[in-house]
Structures are given as C-alpha cells and as structure tokens.
C-alpha cells in the first residue's frame, strides 16, 4: 500500500520555485567541477529517525503521525520497509542507513532476533533489486537494551561482550549481503560514569580486542566495506572513550587499528565536544581519516544532541570545503542523522526536512567549489605562512635547524613584526561568495 500517496516525486525546480515539495538548489544532474551533485553529495536517509522515530521525549509520549504505525511487531517492520522504499524513490535519494533494531524487533532470544532480521533483510534485498537506493552503512545497536547498561565491548560483564560480538557478527553478514559501502561503530555506552568502579585500561584493551575481532571476521567473510568510528563526547555516557576525532585517532594508533578505520563525523557531536563541524572534518582530513558524515546540526543554546536537519549555510559550506579538499568522501556519504521537530509530526514534514537539508548542502557544495577554484583562502594562507618557505623557516620545515641555530637566528633579530590575521576580511569574502551563489538564477 502507498504511504505517501499525496506526495509526488521530488524534482528540481530551481531557486525561483515556490513549490515547497521541490528542490531549489539540489539538481542531482548538475555538474560542479568534474562530478554531478549526486556524485559529490551521496545523500542518505537515516532509517531510525525517519521510519522508527515517534517523537517521544523525556517529557511526552510519541506523537508522530505515521501510516505504518497501525501495525505492530513484524508486520510493522515489514510496513516500514515498504514505506522506506517509497520514500527513497520519491526523494530520489541514493543511500540509506540503519541499526539492526531499526529494521526488525529483538526477539526473546538471540536466535529469534536473528530470525526476525533474516526475514526483513530478505525483504530489503528484494526491494533493492529494483531500487537505485543502496546501503551506505549499517550497524549494531549496542546501547538501547538494558544488557548494555555498563557498555558493550567495554562492559565489566564478559557475557555482554560476547553478546555484543554476536550482534556485530550478524551485522557484518548483513552488510556483506546487502552490499553496504561501510560499517559503523558508535560507542554510546563505551565509557564510564566514575573512575571509582572502573578499570579503564582493561576496558580500552577490550574495546581494541573487539575491533580487531571485527576486522578479522570481515576478512573471513570477504566484506570489503570501510569500517567507520563515529566519535561523540557524551550522551548517553558521561565519559565516552571516542570523545572526538583526535581522541579516537589516538586510540586507533595505540592499538594498531588505524589502517582499518576511518571516521564518520557528525556535526552535532562536534558541537558537544566543543568543536565546530569543520574542525572535526579538518582533523580527520589532514590525517587521511575522513570517511563519511552524519549531516545534521545542533542547537547552540542547548547542551544535548538535538539532531536537527542541517540548514546553516555557513556550516554546510565549510563542511563541503573540507570534503572537496579531501577529494570527496570515497565510499562514504552525507547521511541525514536528523529528525523532524516534535511539532512537525505529519508525514509530509519528512519530505520538507530532507529537501531543506539537501538544498543546504547543494548550496554549500557550490560555494565551496568556487572558493577552492578561486583559491580564496589558499592564497591568503600561503602568504601567511610564507616565512616557512625560505630562510630559517625553511630549515625548520626541512629538519635541518636545531636549538643552537635557532638561538643564533633569534639573537640577531630586532623587534619581531607580525601581520594581521584578517579574520573579518575573510569572513566578508565568505559572505560574498555565499550570497552570490544564492542570488544566482
């Protein structure tokens, strides 16, 4: 049965369009540089927020109007698959993502859970045969069920570690079967509340053991997708071990895992870590670790993960700047890990939200491409650091200087003159490029 029968396929109509159910800036076939927008952006729908989210919060019950919610159990799971692929087709989106519990309910036993997953994966596989929409990534939910109260791979209970491993094993088998481009690890419960009852060294060692086992099993079954770590500093756990890119990178390097992983970076997680979105992208990029993106935004006035759809054009521009500088996302994409607000409870709001996010990143892509083509920031940065291309600066970079040589150089200096960083000028240029792209017809 159709679930969005009042919605037609979303088409590109251009900036002058007044149709709320049309793209104003995202034209999948438009070339930006040597790729189309669709190839650059690789958009993805998050199954959990879009098809399982009900709008509930700590202060109120679920209120989302979803036609498929008239069903329950496995019938509900099947209806969600039907609704999902109708949504994908009407939005003309190339990818989707899910956790295992998003697509099928957990059973009374692990075997029953596997059976439920197999039934729904069979159904998804059939739909994918005739759909352009592919699986960007999947993952195992290792944080919702009470068994994970003390963590999964970092749990103090070895039985929980084993159960988590079984779920990831199944997840990797599903990833291979459905042709997932990536597989994600997010450690929402991998951390601690107090050191008074925590063996941090054992927990970190066990987390590394767990990830090495995952790498080994992927090789065993021939899954060649990219493994991704998704950093987040807090929520639900006070001290999460994958606080930010730098922290997680240090962990991967320490335990010999760096060659097997890249990062899935979420904008709102960067906010919670006290960073900008572009900061996290830059840190990952310069270390060759930028793999994929969870595209959303947070509310700067609130201290939790609000998962709003991305509409901040400065943020999308600076994000796309980093992604283009990275040469793209490879097998990754821009997954809308975002939910409509609780007050936006009608089915068509799902389309309005995704259109807003897709248009926002399309603008960001075009502005970022122009900034890079015109070398707006590159030229300024090169001039700013010019002292390292000649004289004593060049010797520092080439490793031929030492403290003796640097002291001798410093002793002959007079008063050192610095130059302005010109932040305001550069922000004005960013505004100019952004406004020019938005004004173009």
From Swiss-Prot:
Cofactor-binding details, from the entry: Binds 2 manganese ions per subunit.
Originating organism: Geobacillus stearothermophilus (Bacillus stearothermophilus)
Disulfide bond residue pairs: none
TM region(s), chain numbering: none
Compartments where found: Cytoplasm
Enzyme Commission (EC) number: 5.3.1.5
Keyword Nucleotide-binding: no
Chief localization: cytoplasm
Stated name of the protein: Xylose isomerase
GO molecular function: magnesium ion binding; xylose isomerase activity
Lineage: Bacteria, Bacillati, Bacillota, Bacilli, Bacillales
Name of encoding gene: xylA
């Amino acid at each position: 049965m159709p679930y969005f029968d009042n919605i037609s396929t979303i088409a590109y109509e251009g900036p002058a369009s007044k149709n709320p159910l049309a793209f104003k800036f995202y034209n999948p076939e438009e070339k930006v540089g040597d790729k189309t927008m669709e190839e650059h952006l690789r958009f993805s729908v998050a199954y959990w927020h879009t098809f399982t989210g009900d709008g509930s919060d700590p202060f109120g019950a679920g209120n989302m109007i979803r036609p498929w919610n008239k069903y329950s159990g496995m019938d509900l799971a099947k209806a969600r698959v039907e609704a999902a692929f109708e949504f994908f087709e009407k939005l003309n989106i190339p990818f989707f993502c899910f956790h295992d519990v998003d697509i099928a309910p957990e059973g009374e036993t692990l075997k029953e859970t596997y059976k439920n997953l197999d039934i729904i994966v069979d159904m998804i596989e059939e739909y994918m045969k005739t759909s352009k929409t592919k699986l960007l990534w999947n993952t195992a939910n290792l944080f919702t069920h009470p068994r994970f109260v003390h963590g999964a791979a970092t749990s103090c209970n070895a039985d929980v570690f084993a159960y988590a491993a079984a779920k990831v094993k199944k997840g990797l088998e599903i990833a291979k079967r459905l042709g997932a481009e990536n597989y994600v690890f997010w450690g929402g419960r991998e951390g601690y509340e107090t050191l008074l009852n925590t063996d941090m060294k054992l927990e970190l060692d066990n987390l590394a053991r767990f990830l090495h086992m995952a790498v080994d099993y992927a090789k065993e079954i021939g899954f060649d997708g990219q493994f991704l770590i998704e950093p987040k500093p807090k929520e639900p756990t006070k001290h999460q071990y994958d606080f930010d890119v730098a922290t997680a990178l240090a962990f991967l390097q320490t335990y010999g895992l760096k060659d097997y992983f890249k990062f899935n970076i979420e904008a709102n997680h960067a906010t919670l870590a006290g960073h900008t979105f572009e900061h996290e992208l830059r840190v990952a990029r310069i270390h060759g670790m930028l793999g994929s993106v969870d595209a959303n935004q947070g509310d700067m006035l609130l201290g939790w993960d609000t998962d709003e759809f991305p509409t901040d054009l400065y943020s999308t521009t600076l994000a796309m700047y980093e992604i283009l500088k990275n040469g793209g996302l490879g097998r990754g994409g821009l997954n809308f890990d975002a939910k409509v607000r609780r007050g936006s409870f009608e089915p068509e709001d799902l389309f309005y939200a995704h259109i807003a996010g897709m248009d926002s990143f399309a603008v960001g892509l075009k502005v970022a491409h122009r900034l890079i083509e015109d070398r707006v920031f590159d030229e300024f940065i090169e001039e700013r650091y010019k002292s390292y291309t000649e004289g004593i600066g060049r010797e520092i970079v080439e490793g031929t200087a030492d403290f003796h040589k640097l002291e001798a150089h410093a002793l002959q200096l007079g008063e050192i003159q610095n130059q302005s960083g010109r932040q305001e000028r550069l922000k004005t240029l960013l505004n100019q490029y952004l406004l020019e792209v938005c004004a173009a017809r």
